[in-house]
Structures are given as C-alpha cells and as structure tokens.
Amino acid sequence: MPDSSTQDKIVMIATDGACKGNPGFGGWGALLRYQGHEKAISGSENPTTNNRMELQAVIEALSCLKKPCQIELSTDSKYVMDGLTRWIHGWQKNGWLTAAKKPVKNADLWKQLLALTRQHDIAWKWVKGHAGHPDNERADQLASDAAIALMQQEKA
C-alpha cells in the first residue's frame, strides 16, 4: 500500500460505458481524482456499442490530463482490461488483425487509447461492476445518465 504522500501524487480514475440497446444509445462516464480535487465527465453517442463506450470513457479521461501522470485506473470492462494488458501489442504487431486474421473491432479507438497510454504510467485495475465500488458506481451512473439524456433528446 503506497504511503499517503505517494498516494497524493496518483491520479485516480474510474471509467464506465453504457448502451441502451447494443448497438443503440450509448454513454460513457469517468471520474478523476487528484490531490483532493474531483472531476466528473461524460458524453454520449448514437448508434454505438457498449464496448465503444467503455473505450471512449478511458480515452476521454486520459485526454483530460495535461502532462504525464502516474495513474490508477479502474474499469469493470474485461474487454478494456484484456485489450490493453493482453491483446493490443499482438494486434499492433499483426497490422491490427486478430489471431484469427480478422480486423480488430474498434481499432480506431484502440489506436487512440494506445497513444494516450504511452504518455502515462498506468496501473490498471479491474473491478466487478454493480458490486458496490463507489467510484465505479458513479462512473456507471454518469454513463447511463448520458445515454438516457441522448435517447430522450433524440425522441423529443
């Protein structure tokens, strides 16, 4: 466990994506914390997928940072976790093709995310969704609210 002086220098980020229908109305949300300051961000898109919104949440959160940072980033998305920690370098090496030689889905977002992750020192943390993790619950609410707001706006 890092001591409090080390912990104060870490940007804590929680991200989540949501989709009402898949594909359908999507939203993303992120919560950033640093030295007692907190920033909540969200956005939406239609049509989209839950996986695109999960990726967009991480991209938008990292894009908020103005200089290289030490980050602890939590997500409930196995897709994001496995993509970044297990698959992305193989995809890149294979010209953005999967092991089955099929084009990587969401390669546009994976490429953006890869470029952003290279600017920071990131500790990736998977958390179980809808299991009472306060920051994940907040990110989930931001994402869900953004998707619902877009759905209501487009149906009005």
Curated annotation (Swiss-Prot):
It is found in: Cytoplasm. Its main location: cytoplasm. It catalyses: Endonucleolytic cleavage to 5'-phosphomonoester. One of its GO terms (molecular function) is nucleic acid binding. The keyword Zinc-finger does not apply. It comes from the Bacteria. Gene3D superfamilies: Ribonuclease H-like superfamily/Ribonuclease H (3.30.420.10). Its EC number is 3.1.26.4. GO terms for cellular component: cytoplasm. Residues 7-148 form the RNase H type-1 domain. Mg(2+) 2 binds at residues 16, 140. Disulfide bonds: none annotated. Binds 1 Mg(2+) ion per subunit. May bind a second metal ion at a regulatory site, or after substrate binding. SUPFAM superfamilies: Ribonuclease H-like (SSF53098). InterPro entries: RNase_H, RNaseH-like_sf, RNaseH_domain, RNaseH_sf, RNaseHI. Its cofactor is Mg(2+). Endonuclease that specifically degrades the RNA of RNA-DNA hybrids. This is Ribonuclease H.
